[in-house]
């Protein structure tokens, strides 16, 4: 039988890593109302589905479907963290404020929300 990583890891572990990558929380960008999204846990399903938990919920969550909701910005930030080695940055729109002649009035440095999310996938052997 092929490996079933989502079921082996479980829904709560998937939710934990979702939180590490900035899901289920507002990004703090500060423009317009913002949704934190939702990365469901077993307790969330117990509350919202009258205590009934089915294994398929884990599979749906693993592929971002079912009760999982995320914003486009959350998704972009998580991809950036994957690409840069595990640092989740606070999103910002402005890098610097300049006068009409190009003089810098104020600069905004990148701010780290979480550093070194780390490796969470087990190493796979290529030998058969």
How would you label these PLM feature ranges?
Residues 1-128:
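Beta-lactam-recognizing serine transpeptidase/beta-lactamase-like catalytic domain environment
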């Amino acid at each position: 039988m092929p490996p079933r990583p989502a079921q082996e890891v479980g829904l709560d572990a998937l939710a934990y890593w979702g939180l590490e990558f900035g899901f289920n929380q507002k990004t703090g960008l500060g423009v317009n109302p913002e949704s934190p999204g939702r990365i469901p846990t077993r307790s969330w399903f117990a509350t919202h589905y009258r205590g009934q938990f089915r294994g398929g919920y884990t599979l749906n969550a693993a592929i971002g479907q079912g009760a999982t909701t995320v914003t486009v910005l959350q998704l972009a930030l998580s991809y950036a963290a994957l690409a840069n080695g595990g640092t989740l940055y606070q999103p910002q729109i402005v890098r610097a404020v300049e006068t009409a002649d190009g003089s810098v009035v104020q600069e905004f440095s990148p701010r780290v929300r979480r550093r070194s999310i780390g490796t969470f996938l087990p190493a796979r052997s290529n030998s058969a």
